[in-house]
Design a protein with these regions (language model features):
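Short, small/polar residue-rich loop motifs at catalytic or cofactor-binding pockets
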Residues: 278, 407-410, 475-477
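C-terminal motif of bacterial Sec signal peptides marking the signal peptidase cleavage site
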Residues: 15-17
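Bacterial signal peptide processing site
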Residues: 19-21
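Extended C-terminal subregions enriched in glycine
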Residues: 470-472, 506, 515-562
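Active-site rim segments in enzyme catalytic domains, especially the processed small/beta chain
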Residues: 88-95, 101-105, 109-112, 262-267, ...
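Noncatalytic scaffold domains of N-terminal-nucleophile
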Residues: 23-63, 67, 75-245, 250-295, ...
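Bacterial N-terminal signal peptides that target proteins for export
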Residues: 1-8
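Internal maturation/activation junctions in enzymes
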Residues: 32, 316-428, 437, 582
Length: 592
């Protein structure tokens, strides 16, 4: 029924070239992992809509979501269409071969749809050990060893069952049209193809992403994906079971096991038994707002709740932004100092206590206890504490420290529909291009490397985030929905890619909107900053020199880097809804 208007809309978007108008201790190694390469700064002022808004990482994906809402669909319908298009046009970041965390507000409650990948039943705590030692990180990433059972397709189906309005099959039409007729390779995808040293080693990926002479396909060239179109047609007509059983599942398992040097243990049983989970949202209060996010296996909301619990007693509003390098606002040295010290303490606790709560006892209430956070916050002094130690929250078990790297190839979607339903969804295949295994036109994840490579820490204590069969690896994905604490009215949908730096990207944005009176786009535009219990990380080229020097004077070990977040969000304002997208990437928003 919807094929003609949706196909026409996508074709028009393609013809228009996708142009959119915008209205001193040694740190843990994981803190030094840089986000995906930058796309260059593209100035964005935000997009205004009265009735609804869609924000995502690629204009074609945004257009797909926009058309779904125009056709009478819900925010969840739109999010599904957006994610399917992202599988095609932003394959390095997310897709049906990966996992997702989706928050949904239906006007009554916040539900958390957990599509995080799971470890195979044959996985053991020795999965990433070699000769008694943890293997080199990328030796674990590249190949079948790192592939977990993908969860996104099941999660999308569960969300649609509960919140969808349009027929399931219609949600696939924009992605199928683009896969069959072709899409234009974006500058970001082209740049990442040029820089990746592993992807071309996979024959299927090489044939798709590279030319006959081995050079990557250039930005602006058109690419079709008939293999993915066929998969999407199958899922549209047969439903999610077709992904987890039968030929499509068998192809995934065969690909994982066939890697010549690093085969994996994913089985047909692992895929057939995968289930998405419906959880309750996890919320905390800050200033006049109630901030709701994802519970375990995400660590993001717990960490943010701790950070802002420690900052609640500080007069952050008085620490107004200063003038940045390009004359735009930037956080002051004192604001960065207080935030980064709180983040060190939160990350220390995160690394010790947070993992899949279906497998380990996570002391959530203790970690967010106001008295505990007051004691932790009292550790913040005038000078940087350097490397923070984990605390002992109420009901905390004895756990070992985990320094698992978490790589930043992820995407975020924020949508509010005409009825006020809101979605905040972060999805990922983990590293850029995931495991570098391509099957049937899409890439498989490497999410198992989000587990700790070791099961015991140096003191012999068990690591909460160790590999166990069927377990979901800890994530930092932090999709948020923010509400007015008094009225209960939705204020914002917000999130970002960026690996474990997601927590600080989202935290910076909350400071901007909740303490400094910035609108969502202005807060996203602020130079990024934070700490992951290593150095204090600042955005190169945009952080004022005076701020850098002031932080060094306070004892901070400062690292300047690109800090390429990919924040997307929607914020209520006087005119309806403000859509916001990160100038550091290619995202846009569109509403009406």
């Amino acid at each position: 029924m919807l094929r003609k208007p949706l196909g026409l809309a996508i074709a028009l978007a393609l013809l228009a070239g996708c142009a959119a108008q915008q209205s001193p201790q040694t740190p843990p190694a994981h803190t030094l992992i840089a986000p995906e390469a930058a796309s260059g700064w593209q100035e964005k002022q935000g997009w205004q809509g009265h009735d609804f808004m869609v924000a995502a990482a690629n204009p074609l994906a945004v257009e797909a979501g926009y058309q779904m809402i125009q056709a009478g669909g819900s925010a969840v319908d739109a999010a599904i269409a957006v994610q399917l298009v992202l599988t095609l046009v932003e394959p390095q970041s997310s897709g049906i071969g990966g996992g997702s965390l989706m928050l949904v507000w239906d006007g009554k409650q916040v539900a958390a749809v957990d599509g995080r990948e799971t470890a195979p039943t044959a996985a053991t705590d020795q999965l990433f050990m070699k000769d008694g030692k943890p293997m080199a990180f990328y030796d674990g990433v590249v190949g079948g060893r790192s592939v977990g059972a993908p969860g996104t397709v099941r999660a999308l189906a569960l969300a649609h069952q509960r919140y969808g309005k349009l027929p399931w099959a219609s949600l696939f039409e924009p992605a199928i049209t683009l896969a069959e007729q072709g899409f234009v390779i974006s500058p970001r995808l082209a740049a990442l193809l040029t820089k990746d040293p592993y992807l071309a080693k996979d024959p299927d990926a090489r044939a798709y992403f590279y030319q006959a002479d081995g050079s990557p396909r250039a930005a602006g060239s058109r690419l079709t994906n008939p293999a993915l179109a066929k998969v999407l047609r199958t899922l549209a007509s047969e439903g999610p079971d077709a992904f987890y059983r039968g030929p499509l599942a068998e192809a995934m398992v065969a690909k994982v096991h066939a890697h010549p040097t690093n085969p994996g243990v994913l089985s047909a049983v692992d895929l057939a038994s995968y289930r998405a989970k419906l959880r309750d949202g996890l919320c905390f209060d800050y200033r006049q707002s109630r901030v709701c996010g994802f519970p375990s296996p995400s660590s993001g909301t717990i960490a943010l709740g701790q950070i802002f619990g420690m900052l609640e007693s500080r007069d952050m509003a008085a620490l107004k932004p200063v003038q940045g390098e390009q004359g735009q606002p930037a956080a002051s040295a004192e604001a960065i100092h207080l935030y980064s010290e709180a983040a060190r303490l939160a990350f220390a606790d995160r690394n010790q206590y947070v993992a899949d709560s279906d497998y380990v006892a996570v002391p959530v209430s203790g970690l967010l206890d106001k008295h505990y956070l007051a004691r932790r916050g009292a550790l913040i002094g005038e000078r940087s504490m350097g490397l923070a130690n984990a605390g002992t929250p109420p009901l905390a078990p004895a756990r070992g420290q985990d320094a698992t790297p978490e790589l930043p190839s992820t995407s975020h979607i924020s949508i509010v529909d005409k009825a006020g339903m809101a979605v905040s969804m972060t999805s990922s295949i983990e590293d850029g291009f995931g495991s570098r295994l391509m099957v049937n036109g899409y890439l498989l994840n490497n999410q198992l490397t989000d587990f700790s490579f070791t099961s015991l820490d140096a003191a012999g204590l068990p690591v909460a985030n160790r590999v166990e069969p069927g377990k979901r690896p800890r994530s930092s994905m932090s999709p948020l929905l923010v509400f007015d604490k008094s009225s209960g009215e939705l204020e914002m949908s917000l999130g970002s890619p960026g690996g474990s730096a997601i927590i600080n990207y989202v935290g910076k944005t909350l400071l901007g909107t909740q303490d400094w009176g910035l609108n969502l786009q202005q807060a996203i535009n602020l130079p990024n900053f934070g700490s992951r219990n290593g150095p204090t990380e600042l955005e190169a080229g945009r952080t004022p020199t005076a701020v850098v020097e002031a932080l060094k004077a306070k004892g901070h070990e400062v690292v300047l880097s690109e800090q390429t977040s990919g924040l997307q969000g929607v914020q209520r304002n006087a005119g309806g809804w403000l859509g916001a997208a990160d100038p550091r990437r290619e995202g846009i928003a569109k509403g009406k």
